[in-house]
């Protein structure tokens, strides 16, 4: 079961149609069967509040804008409502969110950075915090691998992860080639 929450009511109202569109794309591409798409859609519900979303959750994934104050507030709300044994994951693309996460839950906190569109791109970065247990990392790696994803587990937090760092290296090389006159922008 997946509970989806967003403070933007219009975004929350649009979510089921967007999910249905993604599942239709996967069905048309023969990535999943139509009955699997229907079953998946039936497991997703939208809810109005963070407490409603996380009250029975085994895994909570935070995916709000890259703003420390907003993330801190969301983590506090999750901490107040999620079961004590829930794993808390952040989908941050570059922030070190571990100082923002609940102090008493650090052993069960990690970063699970999905690439977009997540229903097509199979890569997921996993980064532990200073106190994240090996068991949590192993469990999350197995969960994502079981979904058909390719999790890349880091030993520690780094800013930028795999694809971002490869893209940065490619950009540097392209600009070097342009500067040296080895290639034209056209």
Language-model features, listed with the residues they occupy:
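Internal alpha-helical scaffold of NAD(P)-dependent oxidoreductase catalytic cores
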Residues: 126-157, 168-186
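A structured beta-alpha segment of the ubiquitous adenosine-cofactor-binding alpha/beta core
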Residues: 25-81
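NAD(P)+-binding Rossmann beta1-loop-alpha1 motif at the extreme N-terminus of oxidoreductases
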Residues: 1-25, 29, 81
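Rossmann-like NAD(P)(H) cofactor-binding subdomain of soluble oxidoreductases
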Residues: 59, 64-124
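Conserved SAM-binding loop
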Residues: 4, 46, 90
């Amino acid at each position: 079961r997946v509970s989806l929450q967003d403070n933007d009511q219009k975004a929350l109202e649009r979510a089921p149609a967007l999910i249905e569109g993604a599942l239709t794309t996967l069905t048309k591409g023969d990535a999943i069967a139509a009955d699997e798409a229907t079953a998946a859609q039936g497991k997703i519900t939208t809810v109005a509040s963070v407490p409603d979303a996380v009250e029975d959750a085994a895994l909570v994934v935070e995916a709000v804008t890259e703003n420390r104050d907003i993330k801190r507030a969301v983590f506090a709300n999750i901490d107040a409502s999620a079961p004590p044994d829930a794993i808390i994951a952040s989908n941050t693309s570059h922030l070190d969110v571990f100082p923002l996460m609940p102090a008493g839950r650090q052993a069960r906190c990690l970063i699970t950075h999905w690439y977009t569109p997540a229903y097509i791109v199979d890569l997921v970065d996993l980064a532990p915090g200073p106190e994240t247990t090996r068991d949590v990392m192993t469990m999350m790696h197995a969960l994502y691998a079981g979904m058909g994803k390719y999790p890349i587990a880091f030993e520690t937090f780094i800013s930028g992860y795999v694809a971002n760092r490869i893209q940065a290296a490619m950009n540097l090389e392209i600009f070097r080639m342009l500067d040296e006159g080895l290639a034209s922008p056209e």
